[in-house]
């Protein structure tokens, strides 16, 4: 009885206008948080409900591991393995190409750049992050695709390699900005101690600063991967959009995102359901990337 009475005393109704305002704002914050949760739940449920029927009709093995996609044929085939591998190879290639450039740029901006030059480079990177995807695709289609065809003697430069180059440029802002923030957060005592022991600036940056900021740098890399695997418009303009297996960097390919974008406007019946199933697979990929990001961040916090 005493516990109940004390609990009631702790729950006080607002009395002053400031208390009422605080209560109302807390309720609004709660509603906003619940709205975000509801959006995620509704999207997840919708993707599952829309994507599972086609997988059930086609067969999960034929759908995920089939190598032929002919959705408009008299006897349609719905194998998305070429799309999955193209997305993985394209994202992996963009990561391999973009991460070293982004990391070195971040080290330069954080540790070595002159303040005036740093301002110019940071401004350029911010502008790069604000360029629409269609502009990247347009520039890639007009400049990169002909250059690839000419450089390698191919009939067309619309291929996996062109998509990798465009994606590597698009993920740079995410990697650079997050990595710079992580490097700036490294305690200066770490670097001062290294320099006092006789290490050079370069040795200090690569052996002390980067390892100390590894969780933040990893977060930037994962964000870049998420950007790359979810990109559609720019990739569709430079990759060729043929449902081929990505057995060569010069092969015209289709990513998971571009498969949905190029067919959804006219799809119907099982074809439309199969496109929703592709979206479900892509959704699972994005969720896994977010899980990896959370694990990386939590691991970094424990190390700190």
Protein language model features and the residues they cover:
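Transmembrane alpha-helix signature in integral membrane proteins
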Residues: 80-108
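Transmembrane alpha-helical segments of polytopic membrane transport and secretion proteins
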Residues: 1-32, 293-304
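Transmembrane alpha-helices
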Residues: 178-179, 201-237
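C-terminal transmembrane helix and the adjacent membrane-cytosol boundary/short C-terminal tail
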Residues: 180-184, 188, 195, 262-304
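Cytoplasmic-entry segments and transmembrane alpha-helices of multi-pass inner-membrane transporters
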Residues: 101-140, 304
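Amphipathic cytosolic juxtamembrane alpha-helices at the membrane-cytosol interface
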Residues: 22, 101, 114-119, 187-188, ...
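Interhelical loop and adjacent transmembrane-helix boundary motif
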Residues: 235-283
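Generic hydrophobic transmembrane alpha-helix motif, especially the helices
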Residues: 126-171
């Amino acid at each position: 009885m005493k516990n109940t009475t004390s609990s009631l005393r702790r729950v006080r109704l607002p009395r002053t206008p400031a208390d009422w305002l605080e209560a109302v704002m807390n309720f609004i914050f709660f509603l906003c948080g619940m709205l975000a949760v509801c959006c995620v739940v509704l999207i997840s449920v919708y993707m599952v409900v829309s994507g599972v029927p086609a997988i059930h009709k086609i067969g999960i093995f034929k759908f995920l591991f089939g190598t032929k996609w002919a959705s408009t044929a008299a006897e349609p085939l719905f194998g998305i393995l070429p799309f999955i591998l193209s997305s993985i190879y394209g994202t992996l290639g963009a990561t391999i190409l973009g991460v070293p450039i982004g990391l070195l740029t971040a080290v330069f901006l954080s540790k070595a750049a002159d303040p005036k030059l740093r301002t110019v480079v940071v401004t350029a990177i911010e502008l790069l992050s604000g360029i629409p995807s269609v502009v990247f695709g347009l520039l890639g289609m007009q400049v990169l695709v002909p250059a690839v065809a000419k450089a390698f003697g191919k009939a067309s430069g619309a291929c996996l390699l062109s998509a990798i180059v465009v994606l590597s440029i698009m993920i740079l802002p995410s990697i650079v900005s997050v990595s710079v923030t992580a490097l700036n957060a490294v305690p200066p005592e770490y670097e001062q101690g290294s320099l006092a022991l006789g290490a050079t600036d370069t040795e200090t940056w690569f052996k002390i600063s980067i390892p100390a900021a590894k969780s933040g740098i990893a977060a930037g890399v994962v964000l870049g991967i998420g950007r790359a695997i979810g990109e559609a418009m720019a990739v569709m303009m430079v990759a060729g959009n043929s449902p081929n297996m990505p057995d060569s960097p010069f092969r015209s390919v289709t990513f998971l995102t571009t498969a949905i974008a190029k067919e959804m406007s006219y799809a119907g019946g099982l074809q439309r359901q199969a496109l929703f199933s592709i979206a479900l697979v892509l959704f699972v990929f994005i969720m896994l990337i977010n899980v990896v990001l959370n694990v990386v961040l939590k691991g970094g916090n424990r190390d700190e």
